[in-house]
Each structure stands twice: as C-alpha cells, then as structure tokens.
A protein has these predicted regions:
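Bacterial N-terminal signal peptides
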Residues: 12-21
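Short alpha-helical "patches" and their helix-cap loops
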Residues: 234, 323-343, 371-380, 486
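P-loop NTPase catalytic cores that bind/hydrolyze ATP
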Residues: 302-335
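Bacterial N-terminal signal peptides that target proteins for export
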Residues: 2-13
Length: 511
C-alpha cells in the first residue's frame, strides 16, 4: 500500500497560488489553457512541449460543482510517428506526487524524469497529467498532522485515532472545497476529459504504484478509450491494503540472498535473517524498550519503542533492498539509536497530503478480502498497520465507497503489460499474479530482485526488454517481451559496528 505521504511543495509552485480566481471564471469544464515552451535534450537539440491546466468539475455528480485545475504537459512525437499510434498518458504515483517541475528543475531526479519522458518520442505523443488535489496548477490539499507521544510505544489505537482526527481536520480546513470529489472515479474522469480536450480518440496508459491503480480505474470505468497499457508495481483496485503474508514473502526473498552474502555472515544468527526477524518480534512482543539518543542539536531525547514500532520497522529500508539486512541486523544486535531517531522523526507533526486517504476510502476493500486480511498468518509479524486506520476511518472521509462493482476485477480484452519485482514490499508481486487471469491479452514480466520501482528502472539492465516495451506501446506487439528478468545480487550494506565475536544475541544492555 502507498504511504499517507508527507507534503513537499517545490519552490516554483508557490507562485502558482497567486493566480487570480478569475482565471477559473474564464473557463468551463473540459477547457484547457496551454503554454508552449522548449527544453534541450542530452544532445543539445531543442524539444518543444506544451504545459497547461485542465479545468474539471471538482465533483462531476453535482451540477453546481466548482471548477478545479489539474496540471498536464504534452511532448508531441516526431513527424515520423506511425499514423494511428495512440498517445501515451503517463500517470504519476503517490498519490501526492507533483512532476511538472521536471521541465524546469535542475536536481538529478527531475533531470532523470525528463530524460525518461523524452525517450517516449520513439513511440509518439506523451501526455503527463498530475493529480487533482495535489497539482502545481491547482489545489495542494494538505493539513498539519498532530505529533505522536514519545512516552509510549506506537499503537494501532493511536494510528486509528490519528486517521480519524485527520479526516475531521481536513473537513474543517477546507469548508470551501468539496472533498467528496476526490474519489478514484473522478481521477479516472480527469484522464477522459484531458483525452477529449487534446483531441484523441484512444490512448495508452503508463503508470506505476498508484499510477497503476489509476490506470486500472480508467480501464474499468472508461474501457473504450484505452488501446493498451503498461503498469508496474501493480496495485489492483481491491488491493489498496496489502496481504501481510504476501509482503512477508517479499522479505523472505530478500533474506534468501542476504543469508548467502559473505559480508553479512559474521552478523547473522543461526537460521539467518528471518531468524533475526523472529527473535526481534519475540523481544518486543515481551516488553517495550526505552531508547535514549541525541538529536541533531545535541539534545537528548527518550522514546519508547514497542511491538507496533517493530512491525512498521520491518518494512522500512526495503525500497533500497541492499540496506534492509544491515538495518535488521543492527536491531537484532541491540543497536537501536538510529532506528529510534527515525521513529522520533516520524512522530513529529508534518503536513499530510489528503488525496491519499480520500482515494483509498473511495475504493475501500471487499468483505471477502477484509476477512483474508484480518485472518492472515503474517499478522503477528506485521500487524494491521497497513489497513486498520484506513478501514476504521473510512466513514469519516467525505469520499463515498464505490463498491465491489468497481473494485473487483472483471475480464477485459485490453492488452496490458505488467512489470513487477518480487522484492516489492509496497505492492507485492502477488498483486500482478492475481490480476493476470482477468487480462487474457495480458503479459507479465516478473523481475527477480526488483523492488517497488517504475517499469524502466526495473528493466535497467535489459535494453532489449525496454525496447520491446516501447514497441508494445507503439504497435501492441508482444513477441519481444520477456517473461522474467533477473537483476544481480546487490552489494548488501554491512552494519556500522564491528561483527560480534559470536552471532548469538548479546545480553540486554541499558539504553
């Protein structure tokens, strides 16, 4: 599941909030306002692009709904583009990820994103769209979260209370906004409106993580407009809350290679990394622990860590999988200070992006899947953090549950390429395996040792596979697509302390 993201507002965005309200009054639903600019590619050649605002109803179910802006950009394909090639609509993840700064920002991430967009020129037109409610050309809906206490361990009870409080705070903070208009159906409607405004009959979809869920919503609610799709780190409409045993299996796959890394051998207990995980679970299930550490300003801070904090920690440091074994082994050998510092940072008040829980509460979960979640054999290890707060607070958020008719998969003949890593702990690989039977024209590429990443990053060592994906987007041809890709074993990080003389658990020491 995606995290309830912390807000980040790029500097160039702030000026956009000064745009006069009359700019919206001059437009009607479905209008676009476009500016034309140019960037230079890696060869120094000028590439023209359009950047603009799509004006859409905040809630299409209400005739008097106010208009909101959604940012988008388009890079047109070369004149040599094959006639009839559908444009690729690139859907960002998150939710709560602004991306249009890639045209002007100079940081490495923005430059890499722009390079990836320009590469789509070999397919045809590329259209990038941001997300309603968190877009550089419209509203950025956030609230300030409340801090969590240091003097008791993290708990599901506190998490539920925090989620419910956030829902009430969101409604109070935006009395002039219709927050019920931020359901997954409205996100899908924005794609259809932009397609129509730009004059396309059919489109292709490209997205990962929430972008994949967004794409699946478009295919479910507007199937006639989609020619084909490429989705990665897949999050099905009924899988917003991850099955704990599927997530745990991803950890087991990382541990398999870590157990065979010579550099980690001196730190491993008998039974390997998963034995360390089990020992940590037993340790923190027995009693919480108070850890004292120094903050950046030198001040001492004490924080209580318990079983719930450990359950959440087991999934930290997994995006960069090479870091995870060293993190777990540090905890196993009772080096808690760095972890305590991370938890303390997470407990501080920070801005929260609202479109995540608004979209999640609109999708919810089927009764059958909720039963599986609550009876999953890995709950003891990972807890109910991934879903309890969302389910308990769903009625507090203004978006309406769209029901099983939308979230449960149906058979579709849209050709889709799924790309999924088996080390993904945010959207486990089983998500793709469960969806594949509903896509008779689907093709899955399973990436061994792939994490929660975008399609082309997962295929970074496979140029032929990348070209085959571009070819699929251009023509629909699947013959060159592999079934499986294997990434090399990563160079696992080593704990920052010297190996113990024995890999047995050291005696408890005062913190």
């Amino acid at each position: 599941m995606r995290s309830f993201g912390k807000a980040y507002v790029p500097r160039f965005v702030l000026a956009l909030f000064l745009l006069p309200l009359c700019a919206f009054a001059q437009h009607k639903a479905g209008d676009i306002a476009v500016e034309r600019h140019a960037v230079h590619d890696e060869k120094g050649q000028s590439v023209e692009y359009e950047i603009g605002t799509l004006y859409v109803p905040e809630n299409r179910h209400k005739p008097d709904s106010r208009l909101i802006g959604v940012g988008f950009a388009r890079i047109k394909g070369p004149a040599s583009t094959r006639p009839g090639t559908p444009p690729v609509f690139w859907l960002p993840g998150g939710p709560g990820l602004t991306v249009l700064g890639a045209f002007s920002d100079t940081d490495a991430s923005s430059k890499a994103r722009l390079r990836s967009w320009l590469a789509f020129g070999q397919v045809g037109d590329l259209v990038v769209i941001e997300q309603r409610g968190y877009t550089t050309r419209g509203d950025m809906l956030t609230i300030a979260s409340k801090p969590l206490p240091d003097d008791r361990p993290g708990s599901i009870r506190d998490d539920v209370a925090s989620m419910r409080a956030d829902a009430k705070a969101a409604i109070a903070a935006y009395p002039d906004k219709d927050l019920s208009g931020y359901d997954i159906g409205e996100f899908a409607g924005d794609i259809d409106d932009l397609r129509r405004a730009l004059g396309y009959e059919k489109i292709s979809l490209f997205g990962g993580s929430f972008g994949s869920q967004w794409a699946l919503a478009v295919m479910r609610l507007h199937p006639g407009i989609v020619s084909r799709a490429v989705i990665s780190s897949v999050e099905p409409l009924n899988n917003g809350y991850d099955m704990p045993s599927h997530v745990y299996a991803s950890l087991q796959r990382i541990a398999y290679d870590a157990d065979r890394a010579p550099s980690l051998a001196p730190y491993l207990p008998q039974g390997g990394l998963m034995a360390a995980v089990k020992a940590l679970h037993e340790r923190f299930a027995a009693t919480p622990l108070t850890v004292t550490f120094k903050e950046d300003n030198g001040a001492k801070r004490r924080i209580v860590l318990g079983e719930g904090d450990l359950q959440q920690a087991l999934l930290s440091h997994t995006q960069e999988s090479a870091e995870w074994p060293a993190f777990i082994l540090s905890l196993y050998h009772r080096h808690y200070e760095a972890w305590a510092r991370e938890v303390a940072s997470d407990r501080k008040p920070e801005p929260r992006i609202l479109i995540g829980p608004l979209a999640d509460s609109s999708l919810g979960v089927s009764a059958e899947r909720e039963h599986l979640l609550r009876t999953d054999p890995a709950l003891d290890m990972l807890g109910t953090w991934n879903f309890e707060g969302n389910i308990a607070s769903a009625a507090d958020w203004p978006t309406v549950d769209m029901g099983d008719e939308v979230r449960k998969p149906v058979v579709t003949d849209i050709p889709v390429v799924f790309i999924h890593g088996d080390w993904d702990t945010s959207t486990p690989m089983e998500n793709t395996l469960g969806l594949l039977p509903y896509f008779p024209k689907g093709h899955a590429i399973l990436v061994h040792r792939g994490s929660h990443d975008g399609a082309f990053y997962q295929l970074r060592n496979e140029p032929a596979a990348k070209q085959a994906v571009y070819g699929f987007l251009a023509t629909g041809e699947t013959s060159g697509l592999p079934l499986e890709v294997t990434l090399p074993v990563p160079d696992f990080e080593v704990p920052s302390f010297a190996p113990p003389t024995s890999a047995s658990v050291p005696p408890a020491r005062s913190s």
